[in-house]
């Protein structure tokens, strides 16, 4: 059972983030886009944190976040956007949807460990 879901259409970014988190004590699942991410969340009730890109095919990260909150009724899952988008309007939309955090790529892995552990209750 995973406690973190990494959602990114870039296989390289998925691998980097998932490997880093796995090496630091997280149980990680991965998804290729928002649609796949929703399927993973439905299948694994242990997920506590979703780390997602914004711009992805099929379903973007913000739409996925909105569906997590509305369709799945899941307010216990924390959602952090890990993206190159540093746009105030997108951040505001994310906050209104219920996105917990916004991290702009590139990022330092060590800087996210503490907050991610706290969000997962570790």
Question: What are the residue ranges of the model-derived segments?
Answer:
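Receiver (REC) domain active-site loop signature in two-component systems and cognate sites
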Residues: 56
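Active-site residues of response regulator receiver
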Residues: 53, 83
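C-terminal output helix
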Residues: 107-116
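His-Asp phosphorelay/catalytic-motif detector in bacterial-type signaling
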Residues: 46-48, 73-78
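Charged docking surfaces used in two-component/phosphorelay signaling
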Residues: 15-23
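Acidic, metal-coordinating helix/loop segments flanking the phosphotransfer/catalytic sites
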Residues: 30-49, 92
């Amino acid at each position: 059972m995973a406690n973190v879901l990494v959602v990114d259409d870039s296989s390289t970014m998925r691998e980097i983030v998932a490997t880093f988190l796995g090496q630091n004590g997280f149980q990680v699942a991965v998804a290729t886009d928002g649609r796949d991410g929703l399927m993973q969340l439905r299948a694994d009730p242990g997920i506590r944190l979703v780390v997602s890109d914004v711009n992805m095919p099929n379903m973007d990260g913000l739409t996925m976040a909105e569906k997590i909150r509305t369709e799945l009724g899941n307010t216990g899952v924390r959602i952090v956007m890990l993206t190159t988008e540093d746009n105030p309007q997108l951040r505001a939309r994310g906050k209104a949807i219920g996105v917990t955090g916004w991290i702009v790529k590139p990022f330092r892995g060590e800087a996210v460990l503490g907050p991610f552990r706290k969000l997962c209750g570790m």
